[in-house]
Amino acid sequence: MTTTHNPPEGAQRLPLDKLHAWEALGYGMFIHFGMSTFVGQELPSGSEPSSLYAPTALDVDQWIRVACDAGMKYAVLTTKHVSGHCLWPSDHTDYHVGTSGNQTDVVEAFVTACAKHGLMPGFYYCSWDNHHRFGSVTWSEAPLERTFTTARYRDFQMAQIEELLTRYGPVGEVWVDIPGPLGHEGRREQYAQIASLQPEAVIMMNHGCTDGSSLRYEYAWPTDLMAIERFMPASNRGYKPWHTVAQTRTDVQDYYLPGEVCDPIGYEWFWVEGDTLRSDRELLGMRLIAQERGTNLLLDVPPDQRGVIPEATVQALRRLHRNMEQFGS
């Protein structure tokens, strides 16, 4: 049986050959690093002083060397997470590395290292911000379905993303986390801005913890990718990238949305003292399942409070690479 699509190439913004090129990357490093690393929790209050962020031996180049040695082809950096603290000196706030205990522009160092080692750079940006509230209601105060952002916050986010996408050169992926509170029009405006500033980049609106079997239109549309967070693709027959999207009763079209699994190498997104690494067997299973079911794997590898990836993590990645060479393809 032949499956047909309307139009045959799909209604998505990017052509199929561009999306297939992204799929061919296969394996990337998610880098969760920032204020949360120093607070010891993923979701800080946003009231922490900027000076608390103070890596003592920051080595961004080491992160990308480790990724390259592990066989990864791209990397995505958390430029701003829930804390609201920015890894670049933003003109739109004073809550950033320029006022912190280590003034290195981490975003600049990241794209420089990616260029040096031949990895595709990507930027993560979180729409939930506990520091820059501007009247928004966050997940800290209400169930996720009742959160919202104000127009002032959305303007702030777009101004910051414009900085990121015009200051540091080309990026291959823009990863917007917790996009639901932006609202449908807010997401459409954000998507359009990113597509205008970086037309070659794939745009991820994170769906949250799902297995990729269905599109959460009301939370994460529009998007170029399907997020599969802390899950593996549901079907052992493989991830199904074609999704039928009904934007209105009369606007029903097929979109090709490649899948990206994201999960940490341990059990926490950020470095937390005492967090344990997954076993070699589990990590190999994650790699093989993602590959066999037709999705990319964005494996989170968090640097510690020094600003380096710990040696135990480096060795785990090397063993995984060797195991993939033996058992994978």
Label each region the model flagged.
Residues 1-329:
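Mature catalytic domains of secreted/periplasmic carbohydrate-active enzymes
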